[in-house]
């Protein structure tokens, strides 16, 4: 008899973390590795945010538990943030804070999914959605988007996938891994469809502040009151404020669902690290100048690297509008190098050149790879040179 649960045996390892682990192993062996696999900014957390955490340690506030669902002061900061960037305010009972947006997503699925409930996920999708749904006995239902439609789902596709078991749809705009952004018109159509059929909307807004070249991010929760009431917003401070190591995520939405998520937090992790909560308060309502500095740096990298990547033999890439990833189709590149599997292709690239990319298979796109441009320009240019040489070899 196996010692492990069915749930764990059916679970896949995160492809992004697995790729990063292999890259770190090669680095430890002395290899020259260029890691473009992890989705984290290369900037140090801004000093004002660091100081807020250190102050809470020095004055003793960080020494103790807080309310499991988050400091009241942090919930108030999130409400202020929503007033400023979303245009509406939320009450404390509509907010739960937890150990990273990834865990908050898990808590949401645990709070609303019953066995065999279906959750519609447009592909490509962020790697953890599907496994978290399955871990909670739900059924992920994938709808394949097209490059021609900029990797965005349509109401017609959603309706074709809908059954009497459909509980929720997942929207991630700007998208990881594609960088696409839904327009207000597209979101309105999807939101009205969800309201009509009483389907919950999970809106993963983690990259909402990172948009480029005049693109605009519209949160679906701002479209109308009925759509807002149907939506649970997932967000955090990791990407916008370069705080991936602080593990601060939160959800905003229906008080009943948020209350259920708060119960799950109280029985699993308890409160988020107290010092990190004080840091998050400063991030959300403190000086925002560094956000624009980082956004401009990402935009410069995007605009510099995109034409170089587009020239790599066998790589076909759509220019992203947000987040910090390229997601090229490498079907021709695989054919040119004699590979039929994208994971074999990325493995060979890593072993031969030291460039770590993420296979698209884990994102539901077996002909694509993901490259993060959340690293310095020198590294990015050298990585493209190595990929070019690999393809021309």
From Swiss-Prot:
This is Asparagine--oxo-acid transaminase. Catalyzes the transamination reaction between L-asparagine and 2-oxoglutarate to produce L-glutamate and 2-oxosuccinamate. Is not active with pyruvate as amine acceptor. May also use other amino acids as substrates. One of its GO terms (molecular function) is asparagine-oxo-acid transaminase activity. Its cofactor is pyridoxal 5'-phosphate. The modification N6-(pyridoxal phosphate)lysine is found at residue 239. It catalyses: a 2-oxocarboxylate + L-asparagine = 2-oxosuccinamate + an L-alpha-amino acid; L-asparagine + 2-oxoglutarate = 2-oxosuccinamate + L-glutamate. Pfam families: Aminotran_1_2.
